[in-house]
Amino acid sequence: MNLVNPSILVACILSFCLGAIGCLAFSPFDIWLIAYLSAAGLIWAATLVERKTAMLATFAWSIGYFGVGVQWVNVSMTQFGGVPVIVSYLAVLLLASYLGLYNLLFSYLARRFGLISPFVLASLFTFTEYLRGVVFTGFPWLQFGYTQIDSPFAQLAPIFGVEGLTFLVILLSSYLVDIVKNPTRKIATFTKIAVIIGFSLASNLLQFVQIDQQKPPVKVALIQANIEQQLKWDPAHFENTLRTYQQLINSSLAENEVIILPESAIPALESKINPLLNQLQKMAAAKNTEIIIGTLYENEQQQLFNSALVLGNQTKPYQLHQSLRYNKHHLVPFGEYVPFGSLLDWMREVFILPVNLAKGPFIQPALFTNKGKFNMAICYEVIFGHQLQQNQLAQQADYLITITNDAWFGDSIGPWQHLQMARMRALELGKPLLRAANTGITAVVGFDGKVIKKLPQFETNTLTAEIATTKGHTLFGQFGHWLIYSLSFICVAFGLFRRQKHKKH
């Protein structure tokens, strides 16, 4: 097989397959080495000699990668949105095609400016991945860096974040492709790979944070009520949902200092369950316990928020419009709001979409408890590392916390990928993370990104743990993405300079 200048058909089939296997590098499969093979497929496709072949192969790789990796989105559409199966898979294909545009841009830039050295390719990919994470509110799902959280290179995350790990995957994969395309240089290329791996492994010698011995561990209880999505908003099932939460809370009050409930735990407007929340406030305060709960909050201007607040504080008791709360900032397009206003509002009727939610500020105060400060991310937000990093920089919180309802995605791989991204936030910022999920996966994650304890999915239960906070700051926590973006800018600038110099000669 001619891998240097293959036919369009061979290039597209091979690229599609190499893209599709990339899913195995992510949770729940966690075969992290496959990321390098899959990424090599992208680099190979994007830098093929013939422009048409390169673009079609890059697109085929993207369809395989995203089509398989995010196929779980069809679960919410078919099971809970009333969308026909064929339409749901067409939607997945459309999403994969859209995400593939960023890889096409990557291929175009690399070929247009002749920037095909490994460091420059990794830098260009950092740029196109940045665009994928911000354009139309962003969808930075399936970034290669997440696959490395259990690899020997994971400690690059506290320095450069998940983007730094993605940079490494693309860099090493580019050198692998170079070996295939230029076998006469393989000794020199293997030497470069060894040096890069050596420097990357050296990150394990750095320690940015350590357990704070001055602060006692907090006894936490994470509640997983396991309310089926079909029943969650069914009025006939409301009392049963209420009983489930009351039983789980009552059994946790005496032994724990902080109890955490999932996103929009009680399926009603906060104003409608005000008596219940006041009751929980009194019960928790009497036991010297505090409850962090997700609610659906309507403010005095009749704006609706996906919200979270603290109950049980003895000095600042719960009040509907006065209590300190966190309002979700990064909303899910077509899930919590319809983008482009009235232009796409017709989709609300076709796909049975929920009402439009308002979004909270980008930077918000931490949720305060007597046992520490909590940096909150609700559901989808936890995939946006920049948001948590900026809030952590402003808040100096003791713990990260994320509450979610992944029941929308059933027993697909989606919730596992979601947990993997939450783990990366803990590793990047060097803070323990607490994750309460309606149907799972509820988990306690250490500051090193390792799962300390977790509950099985679809089990009604409470996860308890004693978790200590840390002292110190990671470089990523201090500088965010600027370190990897600066490195990428320097690499691209140097690549352009060398190309210009080459032209003159």
Curated annotation (Swiss-Prot):
Domain of life of the source: Bacteria
One GO BP annotation of this record: lipoprotein biosynthetic process
InterPro entries cross-referenced by the UniProt entry: Apolipo_AcylTrfase, C-N_Hydrolase, C-N_Hydrolase_sf, LNT_N
Membrane topology: Multi-pass membrane protein
Listed Gene3D superfamilies: Carbon-nitrogen hydrolase
Key word Protein biosynthesis present: no
Keyword terms: Acyltransferase, Cell inner membrane, Cell membrane, Membrane, Transferase, Transmembrane, Transmembrane helix
CN hydrolase domain: residues covered: 223-469
Transmembrane segments: 6-26, 29-49, 53-73, 80-100, 119-139, 152-172, 189-209, 475-495
GO MF, one annotated term: N-acyltransferase activity
Cystine connections: none
Cellular localization per UniProt: Cell inner membrane
Active site: 263, 328, 379
EC number from the UniProt entry: 2.3.1.269
Gene Ontology cellular component terms for the protein in this record: plasma membrane
The keyword ATP-binding is assigned to this record: no
Pathway: Protein modification; lipoprotein biosynthesis (N-acyl transfer)
Cited Pfam families: CN_hydrolase, LNT_N
Entry's family note: Belongs to the CN hydrolase family. Apolipoprotein N-acyltransferase subfamily.
NCBIfam families xref list: lnt
Function: Catalyzes the phospholipid dependent N-acylation of the N-terminal cysteine of apolipoprotein, the last step in lipoprotein maturation.
Protein name: Apolipoprotein N-acyltransferase
